[in-house]
Amino acid sequence: MDDPGARPPGAWVRRHRTVYLCTVDLLRITGTGPLAGEVPISGSKNAALPVMAASLLADEPLELVNVPHIEDIGVMAAMLRHLGVEAERPGPGRWHLHAAHVQAADVGAELTRQMRGSLLLLGALLARAGEAAIAKPGGDDIGMRRVEQHLEGLRLMGADVTETGSAFVARARRLRGAHIFLDIPTVTGTENLLMAATLAEGITVISNAAREPHVYDLVRCLVGMGARISGAGTERIVVEGRGGAPLHGSLHHLSSDYVEAGTYLAAAAATGGSITVSGMRPTDLRSFTNKLRSAGCRVVEGASHVRLAAAPLHAVDMTTWPHPGFATDLQPQFGALMTQARGVSIISEALYENRFRHVPELRRMGARIAIEGRSAIVNGPTALRGTAVSVPDIRSGAALVIAALCADGTTEMAGAFHLDRGYEKLEEKLRSLGATVERVRSATPGQETRDLSGVIGD
């Protein structure tokens, strides 16, 4: 099926009229030693989702290149189609988005529950249609996500914004420029306010703005569509609004996924391997590669690649922080790596309070990890052993993949669909580096009413 979002994580299949089976993907990984080789890095999911939402701001086509073929992209495309956007995938890595006419201003829970990125539609839809109703999103349960800053920023721009028990609703006859100070440099909040500000009247200043690479990517796209924005990549972004006039079409090449690159580098380091990740910006990953060097790895950066040669690992401490600090999306992977390092490492999570969901599964594999508040204390090195584990979210799944690659025996990972939401061609890329990985689809009896975000079919 061409649209990755059209394939649900579990699909109901009718058998003999009365018996329903639920198909579930398992990832089976056998630890086979060091990874070696070169892996090309896919386009950034975190850049693709806001850029896709930005298509609502133009009445001409937006052509995207280097888009990863993952589940969340298909879900975003489905939401855009619901709003009346022409969303097509003409070829690998490409999307054609044309919002000539916005035909709806609401996105229901049947779509938004599948991922957190649905909230990115709020600012763009409000700016284009004058109203937006977005059912409260789903996605990874990694803790509180501060939505109030999005809403308050839109209110400062003149919108009437309410939060019901099930949705965020915003209306504005016209948006006006405002000076918005973010208490915390929220990435999604910065992106939402940027998109709303492009069509507002007057100048909007966003202070304490997020500086993540995908925010910069969104600004590049918006400027290519005719927006007037300065300060991207800094804490102060200035947007000169177009007074309601839509943006024009553009061709935009997405940046590569530094989180994917960091995941493969951590896997190579954990297995004692030597790999090159190519087609990415090493500067996006600098806080992570600096920690790898501190842990003993040999890391060399090129213009568009990073080469790592593993060495005996020693424990280092790490605290997540907004960019250019250590990315929270790489914290679970680094924690898995530290199970193979000599000594005690303290992994602290400053951004989300529920981002250690992988730890119980790592313990099942033999890891010695204690949780104290927002920190994980990792004692290493540990001889991990393969067993059955469950993937709770995307990045926790990546941590479990790393653990499985350096474990003795075979690990079976239930909930592999989480990995499909964030990693393109995961098995194929791991196999190219010498890993033993296979996907197993099993069928288990289930009830028709169980919610797997799936479909009932014959």
Predicted regions: what they are:
Residues 15-458:
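Structural preference for solvent-exposed beta-strand-turn elements
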